[in-house]
């Protein structure tokens, strides 16, 4: 058969409102990759796989940074907090953020699509909703206008805005961010 591999470097460790995005699909990958959120910024990544796949001969795999005890301790502490508090917060705040961005899309024609899970949301900008022609300048303008108001945003791809706030975000910060985005988009019209 074919191996199912999930790259959860960005989407794992609670980001999507579940510990791993694979859980949303109801599947169990053969191999799962995780890093970034795993150790709260400490340099650590992991390959999680079924035993039959990970059975390698001695010396066939090595790592320059593998097994660093400080990074491993950071990962254990991170996982404890994420599992206890932040997965549920990411799910709840992600629903709030997604609903808010979808509301913005009703009022701003430049938003062509909104998609995401938990606190990992993409907002696609278009010149025209019928042709769906990408609008990279709209993303650049929004990122710059938001920065001037104290809101840090990041574009990705050709014409998509990536929204991936911290897992500790609260409703007030979500609402403030949405208000600032709305102000920037309204001023651009």
Where are these regions (language model features)?
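Conserved N-terminal phosphate-binding loop of PLP-dependent enzymes in the Aspartate aminotransferase
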Residues: 1-189
């Amino acid at each position: 058969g074919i191996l199912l591999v999930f790259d959860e470097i960005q989407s794992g460790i609670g980001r999507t409102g579940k510990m791993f995005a694979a859980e949303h699909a109801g599947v169990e990958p053969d191999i799962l990759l995780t890093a970034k959120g795993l150790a709260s910024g400490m340099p650590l990544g992991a390959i999680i796989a079924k035993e039959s796949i990970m059975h390698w001969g001695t010396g066939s795999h090595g790592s320059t940074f593998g097994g660093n005890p400080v990074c491993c301790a950071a990962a254990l502490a991170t996982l404890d907090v994420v599992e206890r508090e932040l997965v549920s917060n990411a799910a709840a705040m992600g629903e709030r953020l997604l609903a808010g961005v979808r509301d913005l899309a009703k009022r701003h024609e430049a938003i062509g699509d909104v998609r995401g899970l938990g606190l990992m949301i993409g907002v696609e900008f278009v010149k025209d909703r019928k042709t769906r022609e990408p609008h990279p300048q709209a993303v650049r303008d929004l990122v710059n206008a938001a920065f001037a108001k104290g809101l840090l945003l990041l574009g990705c791809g050709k014409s998509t805005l990536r929204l991936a706030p911290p897992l500790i975000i609260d409703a007030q910060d979500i609402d403030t961010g949405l208000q600032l985005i709305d102000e920037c988009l309204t001023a651009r019209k």
